[in-house]
């Protein structure tokens, strides 16, 4: 029976400061390191043995993946990194304090930017400070594929090819798979896996550093879902 484990990265430095993060390459906060280590211990206690691990190209997710594997005594497991598992790009909101942004634009508007399935944030230009267009880790991409901002719909469209080409085939081979990524890239994949509606996905929250286990049927429909 295929088994899939999602883990959002541990609390990041900008999570702790209540700032929009997106594609900004922010490190784990000390609390986030401990969350990731504890997640690894819970995986070990549950007896889950991975065949392959997938993560993004952002530091907070990569380190979380490493801690999860290290503290479950599986650091040798192959890891595959992809930009397609990156966090949702928050455009010009990246780096802004969420509370201050709500005071400026209103709680309702910020809630829509954060949780709506198909509303885009204010878009970042390629020439803006912090744009991924000049980041070496994305040098292999067509510039048109580098977003200036994303909603959850676009995040899913970006992540879905990686699911179809890499993750789903591994699961269909009956492998046990770890995906250590981000709140919104995991929400997007959860929407696809669970068939969550555009409306209901607004209410789905995935906590930091807490492994989410999917026990799947052979056709990759969900048999059981639970947190460790």
From Swiss-Prot:
EC number, as in UniProt: 5.4.2.11
UniProt key word Isomerase: yes
Keywords recorded for this protein, A-Z: Gluconeogenesis, Glycolysis, Isomerase
Enzymatic reactions: (2R)-2-phosphoglycerate = (2R)-3-phosphoglycerate
Site (Transition state stabilizer): 182
GO molecular function: phosphoglycerate mutase activity
Identification of the protein by name: 2,3-bisphosphoglycerate-dependent phosphoglycerate mutase
């Amino acid at each position: 029976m295929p088994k899939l484990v999602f883990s959002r990265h541990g609390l990041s430095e900008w999570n702790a400061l209540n700032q929009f993060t997106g594609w900004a390459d922010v490190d784990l906060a000390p609390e986030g390191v401990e969350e990731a280590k504890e997640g690894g211990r819970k995986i070990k206690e549950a007896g889950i043995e991975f065949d392959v691990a997938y993560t993004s190209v952002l530091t907070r997710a990569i380190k979380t993946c490493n801690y999860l594997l290290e503290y479950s005594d599986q650091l040798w497991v192959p890891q595959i990194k992809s930009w397609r598992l990156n966090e949702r790009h928050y455009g010009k909101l990246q780096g802004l304090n969420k509370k201050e942004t709500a005071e400026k634009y209103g709680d309702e508007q910020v809630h829509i930017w954060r949780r709506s399935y198909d509303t885009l944030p204010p878009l970042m230009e390629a020439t803006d400070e912090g744009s991924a267009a000049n980041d070496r880790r994305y040098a292999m991409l067509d510039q048109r594929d580098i977003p200036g901002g994303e909603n959850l719909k676009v995040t899913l469209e970006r992540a879905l090819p990686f699911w179809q080409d890499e993750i789903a085939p591994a699961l269909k081979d009956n492998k046990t798979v770890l995906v250590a990524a981000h709140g919104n890239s995991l929400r997007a994949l959860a929407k696809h896996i669970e068939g969550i509606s555009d409306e209901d996905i607004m209410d789905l929250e995935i906590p930091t550093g807490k492994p989410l286990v999917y026990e799947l049927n052979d056709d990759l429909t969900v048999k059981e879902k639970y947190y460790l």
